């Protein structure tokens, strides 16, 4: 914008702009005045947006210092009122790339603009392949007799829900992803004992993580062989003709089925739509859900227990709401940065927060506790000792010692796994490197001690939540006199909710990332 002053009158000199543009003395030469105006005109061209506001306030036609003209005073009053009630987002609205970054809204059409439809088709194909192996049964087994024993074993019923009914159908993929999960758990524990494994995970970057993943694959094959042998020995009373050839063939088929399922899980992970292991378990639990609720409804209608049925349904929805609330709950610790640029304000941000999940360990403590309580039964099956059989009966779901031992083990594993995922010393060192600090806490050891105290208190809340989640369904069953949660306990619901929320975040992040790729850096008129 170009401002041209033709007559430097005394009236014009009283405005703030022209005090800077025009010298107060009139005895200057016309040549010097023209030079001064030329320089100011050049600077005003470069600042057109700010000069337009200055010109509006310094216009001769609007100059009314005594308020004689009522039209002008009223218009300026309305203009001032509009400015006061204007929101900060409208005042400081970012432009250009900053506006594109802040525009994180997602429309339904954004889903079809990128590669997400193709990824979802691949995901459905992989999940269908994983379910196909469940329906291919092992030969030579009396399935009806086996199912009668399966309904009486609560632990096997729970594992059957994780495999999507694969154990009950005696499918070749009945082991599922469980051997790979066991291998991951073992390597996570070994990483705390052997520093070399910890260096592979943290210091060697992507190459180290790939090498650790390769070790986990090898270990998962070993776990699959051991579990396949255990399953074949468990099926021995139900086999039509238990021979060495049948046992060897069954072990090979079960091992290959587990390896195939693990491969599918890794392919799903590469799609970046969620964790492949979690999505496989999610699919298996969803497939088991109709049968579980079908048995509940048939039992309720046959016994005319309608009050119990309503209690079960209400408890289920309350359980889902409670899980969603706790899964999204965070303990936010404020932190101050020395300096950090943000696109939201277009400047330097000096404060943020450090989020800690209330249930940061997820479902892993419950899985650890369930595996520990199942250990006496597994050993009793191999050894045949009467003492182990007695302990297994007491520690099975419904046993006298099941509930107290389950709560104690959940609390222990939750505390351990919380600090396994978040090392206070490591977090303190990272904050120090980034120039961040917690208010009223010194950097270094004091910060690590503060974070350890916060995590300890959070682990108490998380342990209480997981204990209620593990014991709640059993209490509801005893109150309603229905076995609705048999094989579909709070653990399964926690996995369902956690996997669904994680996949929703991944899909949203993928859509936003696709929008960022389409930003035209020099299309400022669009924003």
Swiss-Prot record:
GO terms (BP aspect): protein transport
Classification via PROSITE patterns: SECY_1 (PS00755), SECY_2 (PS00756)
Similarity comment: family membership: Belongs to the SecY/SEC61-alpha family.
Membrane-topology annotation of the record: Multi-pass membrane protein
Spans through the membrane: 120-140, 170-190, 219-239, 246-266, 273-293, 306-326, 360-380, 393-413, 458-478, 480-500
Subcellular location: Plastid, Chloroplast thylakoid membrane
One annotated Gene Ontology cellular component of this protein: chloroplast thylakoid membrane
Disulphide bridges, residue numbers: none
Name the UniProt record assigns to this protein: Preprotein translocase subunit SECY, chloroplastic
Assembly mode: Component of the plastid Sec protein translocase complex, which is composed of at least SECY and SECE.
Gene3D superfamilies linked: SecY subunit domain (1.10.3370.10)
Role, per record: The central subunit of the protein translocation channel SecYE. Consists of two halves formed by TMs 1-5 and 6-10. These two domains form a lateral gate at the front which open onto the bilayer between TMs 2 and 7, and are clamped together by SecE at the back. The channel is closed by both a pore ring composed of hydrophobic SecY resides and a short helix (helix 2A) on the extracellular side of the membrane which forms a plug.
Alphabetical UniProt keywords: Chloroplast, Membrane, Plastid, Protein transport, Thylakoid, Transit peptide, Translocation, Transmembrane, Transmembrane helix, Transport
């Amino acid at each position: 914008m170009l401002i041209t002053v033709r007559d430097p009158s005394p009236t014009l000199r009283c405005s703030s702009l022209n005090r800077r543009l025009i010298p107060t003395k009139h005895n200057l030469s016309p040549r010097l005045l023209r030079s001064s105006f030329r320089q100011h005109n050049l600077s005003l061209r470069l600042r057109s947006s700010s000069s337009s506001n200055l010109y509006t306030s310094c216009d001769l036609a609007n100059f009314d210092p005594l308020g004689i003209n009522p039209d002008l005073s009223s218009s300026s009053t309305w203009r001032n009122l509009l400015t006061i009630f204007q929101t900060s987002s409208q005042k400081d609205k970012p432009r250009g790339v900053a506006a594109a970054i802040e525009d994180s809204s997602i429309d339904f059409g954004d889903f079809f603009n990128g590669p997400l439809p193709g990824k979802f088709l691949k995901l459905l194909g992989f999940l269908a392949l994983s379910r196909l192996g469940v329906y291919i049964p092992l030969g030579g087994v009396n399935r009806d007799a086996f199912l009668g024993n399966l309904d009486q074993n609560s632990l096997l019923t729970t594992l059957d829900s994780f495999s999507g009914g694969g154990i009950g159908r005696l499918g070749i993929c009945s082991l599922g992803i469980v051997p790979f999960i066991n291998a991951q758990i073992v390597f996570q524990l070994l990483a705390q004992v052997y520093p070399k494994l910890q260096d592979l995970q943290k210091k060697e970057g992507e190459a180290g993580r790939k090498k650790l993943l390769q070790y986990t694959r090898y270990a998962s094959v070993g776990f699959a062989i051991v579990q396949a042998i255990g399953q074949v020995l468990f099926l021995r009373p139900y086999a039509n003709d238990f021979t060495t050839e049948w046992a060897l063939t069954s072990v090979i088929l079960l091992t290959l089925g587990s390896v195939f399922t693990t491969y599918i899980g890794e392919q799903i992970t590469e799609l970046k739509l969620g964790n492949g292991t979690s999505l496989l378990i999610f699919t298996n639990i969803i497939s088991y859900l109709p049968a579980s609720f079908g048995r509940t409804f048939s039992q309720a209608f046959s016994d005319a227990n309608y009050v119990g049925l309503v209690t079960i349904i209400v408890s289920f929805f309350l359980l889902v709401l409670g899980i969603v609330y706790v899964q999204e709950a965070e303990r936010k610790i404020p932190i101050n940065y020395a300096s950090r640029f943000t696109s939201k304000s277009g400047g330097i941000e000096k404060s943020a927060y450090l989020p800690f999940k209330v249930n940061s360990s997820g479902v892993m403590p419950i899985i650890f506790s369930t595996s520990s309580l199942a250990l006496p039964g597994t050993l009793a099956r191999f050894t045949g000792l009467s003492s182990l059989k007695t302990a297994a009966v007491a520690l099975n779901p419904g046993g006298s010692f099941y509930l107290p031992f389950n709560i104690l083990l959940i609390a222990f594993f939750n505390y351990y796994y919380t600090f396994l995922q978040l090392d206070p010393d490591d977090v303190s060192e990272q904050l120090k490197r980034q120039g961040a600090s917690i208010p009223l806490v010194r950097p270094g050891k004091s910060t690590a001690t503060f974070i350890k105290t916060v995590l300890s208190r959070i682990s108490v809340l998380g342990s209480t939540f997981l204990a209620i989640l593990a014991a709640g369904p059993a209490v509801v069953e005893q109150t309603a006199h229905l076995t609705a949660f048999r094989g579909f306990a709070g653990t399964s619901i926690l996995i369902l909710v956690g996997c669904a929320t994680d996949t929703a975040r991944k899909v949203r992040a993928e859509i936003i990332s696709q929008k960022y790729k389409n930003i035209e850096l020099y299309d400022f008129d669009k924003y």
